[in-house]
C-alpha cells in the first residue's frame, strides 16, 4: 500500500516505533513513537503509543485548521501528560483486578460491546483477550447485539461493555 501511494505521488506519513525501519525509509515523513522494543505478543506498547501519536497529530491539525483554540489544545496535551499517572492508578488496584480475573477466568467466550469510538476499543480489547489469554473473544457494535448475536450469550459467556462517551449512554 505504501509503495502504491508513492507510485501515485501521494505523500506518505508513517507512525513507527523503529528508527530506520523499512516503512520509515520509504515514507516521505515519519513520526516516531520511541516506545522501545516490544516484548509482548499483543504489541500493546506499540499500539498505545501509535494511538497517542496520531491523537496528538490530530489535535495539532485541528488547531492549525482553526477547529480548536490553543487553550483547548494545551488542556488536551496536559491530559496526555497525565496518562502514565492514570495507568499507574489502574495498576495499583491490583487486588480488584485480580478479583475480576479470578471471577471470570472460567469464561469460555468473551464479548466486548461498544458503540462509536468504543467499538474500536472493543475490537482491540477482544484481540488482546485472544492473544494473551487464548480465550475466544469477539467485538460487537452495541446496536447490533440484538440482531442474532444476543442468542450466543449463555452460561460461561462474559460480556464486557465499554462506554467512554457520555452522549451515548442512552443508546448503549
What are these regions (language model features)?
Residues 1-172:
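A SIS-like phosphosugar-recognition module
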